[in-house]
C-alpha cells in the first residue's frame, strides 16, 4: 500500500484531515482529497487556523496540521529556522479545536475568509 493510500485510509477512518507542507515548506498536500463542501470548509478552516496561530505567536512556519474531528483535537507541527541557520527546529502542539479558535477569535481576516466559503 502506498503512502498516499495509507494516509487516505487513516483520514477516512479517524475523520481526520491532514495538511502537510513539503520539505521546502511550500507545497501543500491534503487528505482526504474531496470536493465535498463541508469537508473543504473544515479543511480550509483548519489550515487557516494553523497558519494564523503560528504567525500570531511567531512560532515559525506550519509544517503539518492533523485535525481529528472525531476526537475534537488538533496536532500542529511548526518548523522554525535555528538562529545560527544550521537547520530547523520542529515543535509539536496538541490542542482542542476550541483552544485554536479562542486564540484567533480576534482575527477579522480569518472570519471574512471563512464566511465566504
UniProtKB/Swiss-Prot annotation:
Induction: Differentially expressed during meiosis. One of its GO terms (cellular component) is Ragulator complex. GO terms for biological process: regulation of TORC1 signaling. It comes from the Eukaryota. This is Uncharacterized protein tam1. It comes from Schizosaccharomyces pombe (strain 972 / ATCC 24843).
Amino acid at each position: 500500500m502506498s503512502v498516499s493510500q495509507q494516509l487516505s485510509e487513516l483520514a477516512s477512518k479517524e475523520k481526520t484531515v491532514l495538511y502537510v507542507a513539503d520539505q521546502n515548506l511550500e507545497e501543500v498536500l491534503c487528505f482526504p482529497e474531496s470536493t465535498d463542501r463541508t469537508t473543504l470548509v473544515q479543511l480550509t478552516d483548519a489550515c487557516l487556523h494553523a497558519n494564523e496561530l503560528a504567525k500570531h505567536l511567531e512560532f515559525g512556519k506550519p509544517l503539518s496540521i492533523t485535525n481529528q474531528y472525531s476526537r475534537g483535537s488538533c496536532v500542529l507541527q511548526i518548523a522554525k529556522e535555528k538562529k545560527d541557520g544550521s537547520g530547523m527546529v520542529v515543535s509539536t502542539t496538541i490542542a482542542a479545536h476550541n483552544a485554536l479558535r479562542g486564540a484567533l477569535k480576534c482575527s477579522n481576516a480569518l472570519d471574512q475568509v471563512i464566511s465566504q466559503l
